[in-house]
From Swiss-Prot:
Pathway as given in its UniProt record: Energy metabolism; oxidative phosphorylation
Phosphothreonine PTM positions: T141
Protein's name in the database: Cytochrome c oxidase subunit 5A, mitochondrial
One Pfam family, short name: COX5A
Gene for this chain: COX5A
UniProt GO cellular component terms: mitochondrial inner membrane; respiratory chain complex IV
Length: 150
């Protein structure tokens, strides 16, 4: 299918219509010109919010996740233009606890607060939703540690 599209593009690139509608042959372009003429669009389906959440919860729930994968996942998640759902943060905090990485738990909570930006109601909501997990895992928030005053 791609080959047929490339051939059509190559033929279209080598001919042009004159002022009276007659087709004229032009110089034959190189293969790069034919390839550049093809537009490749993704026909894949868009990921729903539920699928996005499930993908990240599954990622952080991997039993063999290591510290590098944890940090990579957190860094990737932080680059998105949104605040992660509490269930994703819960899975990330549990992964931190499995790895005994307390510093990453604080960084995650700080990143969530930063991602909330001027919307002051988001961070307290996330903490409220995560409170049972924070208590279960013995994780203190940056505010409880006094890091918000530094």
């Amino acid at each position: 299918m791609l080959g047929a599209a490339l051939r059509r593009c190559a033929v279209a690139a080598t001919t042009w219509a004159g002022p009276r509608g007659h087709l004229h042959s032009a110089r034959t372009p190189g293969p790069a010109a034919a390839i550049q003429s093809v537009r490749c669009y993704s026909h894949g389906s868009q990921e729903t919010d539920e699928e996005f959440d499930a993908r990240w919860v599954t990622y952080f729930n991997k039993p063999d996740i290591d510290a590098w994968e944890l940090r990579k996942g957190i860094n990737t998640l932080v680059t998105y233009d949104m605040v992660p759902e509490p269930k994703i943060i819960d899975a990330a905090l549990r992964a931190c606890r499995r790895l005994n990485d307390f510093a990453s738990t604080v960084r995650i909570l700080e990143a969530v607060k930063d991602k909330a930006g001027p919307h002051k109601e988001i961070y307290p909501y996330v903490i409220q939703e995560l409170r049972p997990t924070l208590n279960e895992l013995g994780i203190s928030t940056p505010e409880e540690l006094g890091l918000d005053k530094v």
